[in-house]
């Protein structure tokens, strides 16, 4: 019994006072229960793991529910779509749809000094990106993402912009370069928890192995070397390690086979930093045999359990489905996605005690999956986005002023000899090849910016220019080009014009950083009001997107300046 309610002989006043005090205390307690206290928002600070969960700095469980926005890994050296939209509006839309994390693919090319993006429209958009290197553009994206409560996972997607590689090194990009570039980025964003971690290498596949012990092809050992190198720079980062293609003769999607991780786990020097990552796709990427199994889709949970789900189910480590996607055109793909979403565990039922995920992709220009955005880079595919609604999660707290990079990264290490897999390790072709989505561009019809009035160029004394024409991407019926205009004279230009004649039926559908007009096969590109002045020896670039059939030979370009 509470002290105030005990009977004190001859003290009825004390009893009444005690009763009043007790009643008031009870009312206050009930009032506190009646008014819900605001829940602590998840995602603050750097993250760590505990069993199969990811926790924030306050030990609040978080769920990565995100999207892939690619482009830094291509020869555009920047996220795609900035030829149509401002990067901030893109990030705002990602947040508005309920995605809280962006997997940001890149290649080691962007760490080479002076690498510049070549497909950004600066006309009434992206003006604060003008003149920035690719890395500096990445800084801007990371900073704004953090300000609005998004998080970033940096994904070493390719060694260079020419394409994916089975192993983490190639003849031109060594393991030493791979590791030093990871460390440089870790140093660059050190102190900024917007960048929560690194996906060390995208989709290792044959001849990459798991647990075979050969340092030239054992991806598990390479992941330990790279992961520990990153953690030596910033021990607070998460290390995301994908699987391989084959284990004990059992083939799966590239990067999706984690069957060996139970027996041969990745061991890092810093505990509670490891997240395993898998990729999974539907028939629009490749018609794997399990899609035609008569028990489909009931067979799929067992396949997922075997290859990567067991790591979560057995509380070994968190599992992040870093890529999964589909055009959603076939009923099989629709059934696959619905089944997979349930397997990943709906947030309303399981909260953050669930699989982590980032959908492939935000971009519409992924040829075998399409994207959440449609080809105009504005309209949302609400059907596809709707399939993901049950597994979306909350947006995180904004990151403060720490969004600036801590330092410039050191230049990439010059390639040094890397271990080469022996001929005996070359895999035997399997009856069912495993495809990986290679982004291909789809023409995007957006208005061409209007140029400010400029006089027709005349050959003024000392005003000269040259132009170079470079095809960035060609997917068989369309392509993108960057044209570099260089001042080859002795005085600054006031205006410039580049012209050429196509040899086929190429038709320009979109352009940026120049006023481009086409009359039949003849094309003229004139400067905008903001890039007319080029100092001697300096250059500016513009670009365009076009469609074609037949051949697509590069034309000869001419440049005139005044």
From Swiss-Prot:
SMART domains xrefs: CBD_II
Lipid biosynthesis is among the record's keywords: no
E.C. number(s) listed in UniProt: 3.2.1.4
Residues of the signal peptide: 1-41
Biased composition (Low complexity): 401-411, 437-449
Start and end residues of each CBM2 domain: 458-562
S-S bonds: 75-161, 209-212
Keyword flag Flavoprotein: no
InterPro entries per the UniProt record, alphabetical: CBD2 (IPR001919), CBM2/CBM3_carb-bd_dom_sf (IPR008965), CBM2_carb-bd_dom_sf (IPR012291), Glyco_hydro_5 (IPR001547), Glyco_hydro_5_CS (IPR018087), Glycoside_hydrolase_SF (IPR017853)
PROSITE patterns from the UniProt entry: CBM2, GLYCOSYL_HYDROL_F5
Active site (UniProt): 203 (proton donor), 323 (nucleophile)
Domain of life, source organism: Bacteria
UniProt-annotated stretches for the region Catalytic: 42-400
GO biological process terms, semicolon-separated: cellulose catabolic process
Region (Disordered): 399-462
Temperature behavior of the protein's activity: Optimum temperature is 81 degrees Celsius. Thermostable.
Keywords: Carbohydrate metabolism, Cellulose degradation, Disulfide bond, Glycosidase, Hydrolase, Polysaccharide degradation, Signal
Catalytic activity: Endohydrolysis of (1->4)-beta-D-glucosidic linkages in cellulose, lichenin and cereal beta-D-glucans
Similarity comment text for this entry: Belongs to the glycosyl hydrolase 5 (cellulase A) family.
Function summary: Has a very high specific activity on carboxymethylcellulose.
Protein's name according to its UniProt entry: Endoglucanase E1
Biological source species: Acidothermus cellulolyticus (strain ATCC 43068 / DSM 8971 / 11B)
């Amino acid at each position: 019994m509470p002290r105030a309610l005990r009977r004190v002989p001859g003290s009825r006043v004390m009893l009444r006072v005690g009763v009043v005090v007790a009643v008031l205390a009870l009312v206050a307690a009930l009032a506190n229960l009646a008014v819900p206290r605001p829940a602590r928002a998840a995602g603050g600070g750097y993250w760590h793991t505990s069993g199969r969960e990811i926790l924030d700095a306050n030990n609040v469980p978080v769920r990565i529910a995100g999207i892939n926005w690619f482009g830094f890994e291509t020869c555009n050296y920047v996220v795609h779509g900035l030829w149509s939209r401002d990067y901030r509006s893109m990030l705002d839309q990602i947040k508005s749809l309920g995605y809280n994390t962006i997997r940001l693919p890149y290649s080691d090319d962007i760490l080479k000094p002076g690498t510049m993006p070549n497909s950004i429209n600066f006309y009434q958009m992206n003006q604060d990106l003008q003149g920035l290197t690719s890395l500096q553009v990445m800084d801007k994206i990371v900073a704004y993402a953090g300000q609005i409560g998004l998080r970033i996972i940096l994904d070493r997607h390719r060694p260079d912009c020419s394409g994916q590689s089975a192993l983490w090194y190639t003849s031109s990009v060594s393991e030493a370069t791979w590791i030093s570039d990871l460390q440089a980025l870790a140093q660059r964003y050190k102190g900024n928890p917007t960048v929560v971690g690194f996906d060390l290498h995208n989709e290792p596949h044959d001849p990459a192995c798991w647990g075979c012990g050969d340092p030239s092809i054992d991806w598990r050992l390479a992941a330990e070397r790279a992961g520990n190198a990153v953690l030596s720079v910033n021990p607070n980062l998460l290390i995301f390690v994908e699987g391989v293609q084959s284990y004990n003769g059992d083939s799966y999607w590239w990067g999706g086979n984690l069957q060996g991780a139970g027996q041969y786990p990745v061991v890092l020097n810093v505990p509670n930093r490891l997240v395993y990552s898998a990729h999974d796709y539907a028939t629009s990427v490749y018609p794997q045999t399990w899609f035609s199994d008569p028990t489909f889709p009931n067979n799929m949970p067992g396949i997922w359990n075997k290859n990567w789900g067991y790591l979560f189910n057995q509380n070994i480590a968190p599992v992040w489905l870093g890529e999964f996607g589909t055009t959603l055109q076939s009923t099989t793909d629709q059934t696959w996605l619905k089944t997979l979403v349930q397997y990943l565990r709906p947030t309303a039922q399981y909260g953050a005690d669930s699989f982590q995920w980032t959908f492939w992709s935000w971009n519409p220009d992924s040829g075998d999956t399409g994207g959440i955005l449609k080809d105009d880079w504005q309209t949302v595919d609400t059907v596809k986005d709707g399939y993901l609604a049950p597994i979306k999660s909350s947006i995180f707290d904004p990151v403060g002023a720490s969004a600036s990079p801590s330092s410039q990264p050191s230049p990439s290490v010059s390639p040094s000899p890397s271990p080469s897999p022996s001929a005996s390790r070359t895999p035997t072709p399997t009856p069912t090849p495993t495809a990986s989505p290679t982004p291909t561009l789809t023409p995007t019809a957006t208005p061409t910016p209007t140029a400010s009035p400029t006089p027709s160029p005349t050959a003024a004394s000392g005003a000269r220019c040259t132009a170079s024409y470079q095809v960035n991407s060609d997917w068989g019926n369309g392509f993108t080009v960057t044209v570099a205009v260089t001042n080859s004279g002795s005085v600054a230009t006031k205006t410039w014009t580049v012209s050429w004649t196509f040899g086929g039926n190429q038709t320009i559908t979109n352009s940026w950083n120049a006023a481009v007009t086409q009359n039949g096969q003849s094309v003229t590109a004139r400067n905008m009001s903001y890039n007319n002045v080029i100092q001697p020896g300096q250059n500016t670039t513009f670009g365009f997107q076009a469609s074609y059939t037949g051949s697509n030979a590069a034309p000869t370009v001419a440049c005139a300046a005044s």
